[in-house]
């Protein structure tokens, strides 16, 4: 999903609402949201969730494309996480249930991971630009600037 959006942005195309709707209709349905509360999670901590938003490609990088990392994060931090796609797949809503201090700690960890992935992606884009620049300029004549007589 994030790859499709990235490819569209890279081409510079503007998706029309009809194309966007067509893409959404082709996507598989999300898994059902029926979920039982783990035995280790107290009911009273479901009252006040912490909610924040990230770009979808960051959520794919942090949690994996199929969100396989979420149960491990929940078990290790003793929180419950939900990651829901909003805004036509451009953003995800991350909801953290748990004790307030733990919620803030998990949010801080996730935002730190998001920042690292942003920097890593920017660095990779700069390296690709540098490689392209070097390829285009390396094809010219290779004559030394200063001749030794």
Curated annotation (Swiss-Prot):
UniProt-listed Pfam families: MOEP19
Chief location of this protein within or outside the cell: cytoplasm
The keyword Cell wall biogenesis/degradation belongs to this UniProt entry's keyword annotation: no
CDD domains: FILIA_N_like (cd12795)
GO molecular function, a single term: RNA binding
Location of the KH domain: 49-110
Entry annotated with the keyword Membrane: no
Any one GO biological process: establishment of spindle localization
CC annotations in GO: cell cortex; cytoplasm; cytoplasmic lattice; nucleus; protein-containing complex
Keywords of this entry: Cytoplasm, Nucleus
InterPro entries: KH_dom_type_1_sf, KHDC1, MOEP19_KH-like
Cell compartment(s), UniProt: Cytoplasm; Nucleus
PANTHER family in the cross-refs: OOCYTE-EXPRESSED PROTEIN HOMOLOG, OOCYTE-EXPRESSED PROTEIN HOMOLOG-RELATED
Record note on domains: Contains an atypical KH domain with amino acid changes at critical sites, suggesting that it may not bind RNA.
Assembly and oligomerization: Component of the subcortical maternal complex (SCMC), at least composed of NLRP5, KHDC3, OOEP, and TLE6. Within the complex, interacts with NLRP5, KHDC3 and TLE6. As part of the SCMC interacts with the SCMC-associated protein NLRP4F. The SCMC may facilitate translocation of its components between the nuclear and cytoplasmic compartments. Forms a scaffold complex with KHDC3/FILIA, and interacts with BLM and TRIM25 at DNA replication forks.
Family: Belongs to the KHDC1 family.
Role according to the record: Component of the subcortical maternal complex (SCMC), a multiprotein complex that plays a key role in early embryonic development. The SCMC complex is a structural constituent of cytoplasmic lattices, which consist in fibrous structures found in the cytoplasm of oocytes and preimplantation embryos. They are required to store maternal proteins critical for embryonic development, such as proteins that control epigenetic reprogramming of the preimplantation embryo, and prevent their degradation or activation.
Protein name: Oocyte-expressed protein homolog
Organism of provenance: Felis catus
């Amino acid at each position: 999903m994030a790859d499709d959006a990235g490819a569209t942005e890279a081409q510079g195309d503007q998706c029309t609402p009809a194309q966007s709707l067509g893409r959404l209709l082709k996507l598989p349905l999300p898994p059902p949201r029926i979920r039982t509360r783990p035995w280790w999670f107290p009911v009273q901590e479901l009252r006040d969730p912490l909610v924040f938003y990230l770009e979808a490609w960051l959520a794919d990088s942090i949690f994996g494309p199929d969100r396989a990392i979420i149960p491990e994060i929940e078990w290790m931090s003793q929180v419950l996480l939900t990651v829901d796609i909003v805004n036509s797949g451009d953003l995800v809503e991350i909801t953290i249930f748990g004790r307030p201090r733990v919620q803030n700690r998990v949010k801080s960890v996730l935002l730190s991971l998001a920042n690292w992935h942003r920097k890593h992606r920017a660095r990779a884009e700069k390296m690709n630009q540098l490689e392209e620049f070097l390829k285009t300029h390396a094809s010219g004549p290779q004559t030394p600037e200063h001749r030794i007589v």
